[in-house]
């Protein structure tokens, strides 16, 4: 298992990557994207994979790594030097560094070494270039230890750095062969020995081999130190003959090899691993000794590989179970890696490769029982970094790809042990294939301590960063930072930087380029940590702009050539700490996102500020083209030098097949001042005439000062374009420039260090003279695409204010005291009618202190009102836009002044609300103490009802019914026609007026029965319009006469001569719910029940039918004239005078006698019956 060369995109189709000037800029500051210098190389060589700016005595260069140079067979890789600033464009030159990168005394394998995939400059001169897949051969194995070349300033390889510089196959191997008679054919054993020995590097300082053969007895074929080369051992092995024997004394053979073959007398070396390979084809005859013999081997740390040949068992068709168990017991643990079985002698050659690999895997560790690699697959140089004292080399393949960091200082090399970077808090997360050393860096704390930082992006699947310190050559872990998302490759790129240039590290940036966004694309994220003492604390995270991916729904419309390529941005694939680009005194950060824009790529520039960077990027530089010929722009970045001699840091950006050098543009500092004469507007002191009117004129002096940030002492001449806007806070200006009657003027000016110009303007006759007049000047460079850029830390707009002179005596501020009084036409309840829908509010505003400038009343009102006008002040004093603002007084309301006016409203029939709500306030631009503000506000809320305009009609088909004197009552009623006359009642409701028709309830009442229960009006039918839902209290045709049911009349029900009086009749009611409609109609059919009237005594009477209408909406009411309707049906009887009842006659006679007696009594009392004249005559 080997890691990818980086968490960066791979190779695309072969094409030339020409970074022509087809770069477009989304957000621009001072990195010039239109005049870049480009370098091109073969895409298949991954030219542009790494870039570094470089300078030596010969000049300035861009170094470009091309790790696959030598395609397709010999991909050794290399570094190109590309000249900069030579006047004419010169080609890049390959340095051929791999040729001179070498380690003595090993068999080197430089194919596929990917030299140039790591490239860093040495702060003391020269640079370091690495090939992490550099390998050397040990036997038949290739160990990819990796290598780095320390290159001098003159491009000469000074020395090569590699953690392992020789084959460390220090093994003493004794092969114990079963030579008994059952082994057949012996040639197969000889072939097995030949193939196995060919794979070994045999020599006094490498592997030594001895062979022991046993059967009934044990023979030493040759000792460990007998031969000093592989060739000699191969010759000797071919001469070995089968010794034979009827017994297989396996325990004897193993024990003899332990006691004798591994002695110093026979060539065994102290401290060298002991390996025994036992080959046998049958169960031992001394197996009772095996357990002790094997334990003795264990005690002496002899690694044992056992091989069981099953040929004799298979030929004899015998069970192998017991034999296999015995041979397994001989093998070391774990058994599955140390035990082999083959079907017969001929099959021995099939296990040679696997056996050889497992034997030589023992060389990679000092652990006698281990069979894994330590530094043999380390890929040292996968990353590199120069700290203050040490060179840090990432070795991601070390310790079975757990990884490590090799530390080098001069001739001292520290290779940490496998457990060095295991911290207590993370032991529960086993670091399997963590790739520690994927990227390395260092930081300087404020205390002066140097902190070393390494990333392991596969740790616990989420990634981790380790911060440690070197103490007397030992590593002490201080802190770990963990990623948050599985597979994000957190820690695959690290960068530290000193933002404020105080020589102390301020922030650490950790890239997670495969961080998945919301749409499951590899968006990428960069985490920013601030250094506090010796600990890093999370500060913020950075993300790219949103990218659109090739989803299943839009797969056919994607422009990406290979739609199976990763989608997103991979923001954070490269992070570079660059020197101050914008000349603001703070260093900056550049981050690459090589998969943006369909793999075209882009980079983001973040400016420093204080001790960190700003979260929003200052400039984004995307790659140009269609994403097919331009790939992965931003996969490498470097920006440390001024390469064109203008004193500005330039930025080099690499992509697949090329790189571009972007020049920084100088930053122009432009300062603008504006002065005015007079500096205040006094509307009472006119000083000029404009358009035939006296007004106030003002002269403005505008001055420009310019300089360059990089050359502050040099005189700089700038061509500027500027625009002045008068009263820029107002939509309608209160001033115009003289001679143009416009509020804006635009001019060009050339400024050499400093320059001034003049403009004049005048004030218009406007009501608002409280707020100051703001004058705005906007400026820019005449040619913003070339030359310096404006300093983005300074505004390119200047605002100055001209205040108005105040009528406040000697005080600078006017302190007013406004009061508001409000009166309305109604206070308790408003009844709104169509003919009378007006509502008025009277306002009185008074000021009792200093003049109140721009005094105004603001009226907010509920939606059921519509502003219709004002009275008593000028009509243009009020503006209505959802609320009403009325200016009171001009230009101010003086002390003691009072203004009364009236606001007129109409009701809005579109909004029927239960209340009229009005909020009124009086305010001004002058100040008013909080304690006097209470009388500036009035709230009004009045209940309101709306009188619905409608027409309520009622009519009847019959108003008079006459009953003949000779009419009789039919004994049997067969139909309703036998009953009497039909009366049809009609009700009609029609909308009139502007208010909507509410839901109504119509109640129809008619006399149904006499007080004695005799029918009067008999209901036979009910019909209505569609919007009416009627519910009669009695059923139509309750006696079911129309259905054919016959009915008899009986004189027992009503005796002839009964006097009929309908004032006491019982009434029936029909209720109809009428939904809102312009017209509603209800018809009721009734029949006069003649039998009741024929048998009764009366001459004439009236039957009253009542209709009552009621609104179901509390806000919509009906006028009293539209609530009730009555219909009177007169019934008369021909030929019969009305008969007076006997009780009436008797009562009348009694009343007459009583009255006569009372009259006589009264006359008697007054002496009416006395004769005074008679008495006088008698006297």
From Swiss-Prot:
SUPFAM superfamilies: Integrin alpha N-terminal domain, Integrin domains, vWA-like. Ca(2+) 2 binds at residues 580, 582, 584, 588. GO terms for biological process: cell adhesion mediated by integrin; cell-cell adhesion; cell-matrix adhesion; cellular extravasation; integrin-mediated signaling pathway; negative regulation of cell population proliferation; negative regulation of epidermal growth factor receptor signaling pathway; neuron projection morphogenesis. Keywords: Calcium, Cell adhesion, Disulfide bond, Glycoprotein, Integrin, Magnesium, Membrane, Metal-binding, Receptor, Repeat, Signal, Transmembrane, Transmembrane helix. FG-GAP repeats lie at residues 30-91, 101-160, 365-417, 422-475, 476-538, 557-615, 619-679. Integrin alpha-1/beta-1 is a receptor for laminin and collagen. It recognizes the proline-hydroxylated sequence G-F-P-G-E-R in collagen. Involved in anchorage-dependent, negative regulation of EGF-stimulated cell growth. Heterodimer of an alpha and a beta subunit. Alpha-1 associates with beta-1. Interacts with RAB21. Interacts (via cytoplasmic domain) with PTPN2; activates PTPN2 phosphatase activity towards EGFR and negatively regulates EGF signaling. SMART domains: Int_alpha, VWA. Glycans are attached at residues 74, 100, 105, 112, 217, 317, 341, 402, 418, 460, 532, 699, 748, 780, 840, 883, 908, 915, 939, 966, 974, 1008, 1073, 1083, 1102, 1113. Residues 1-28 form the signal peptide. PANTHER family: INTEGRIN ALPHA, INTEGRIN ALPHA-1. Residues 161-360 form the VWFA domain. Ca(2+) 1 binds at residues 498, 500, 502, 506. One of its GO terms (molecular function) is phosphatase activator activity. Ca(2+) 3 binds at residues 642, 644, 646, 650. It is a single-pass type I membrane protein. Belongs to the integrin alpha chain family. The integrin I-domain (insert) is a VWFA domain. Integrins with I-domains do not undergo protease cleavage. The chain crosses the membrane at residues 1142-1164. GO terms for cellular component: acrosomal vesicle; basal part of cell; cell surface; external side of plasma membrane; extracellular exosome; focal adhesion; integrin alpha1-beta1 complex; integrin complex. It is found in: Membrane. This is Integrin alpha-1. Pfam families: FG-GAP, Integrin_A_Ig_1, Integrin_A_Ig_2, Integrin_A_Ig_3, VWA. The gene is ITGA1. Disulfide bonds join 82-92, 688-697, 703-756, 808-814, 878-886, 1030-1062, 1065-1072. A motif (GFFKR motif) lies at residues 1167-1171.
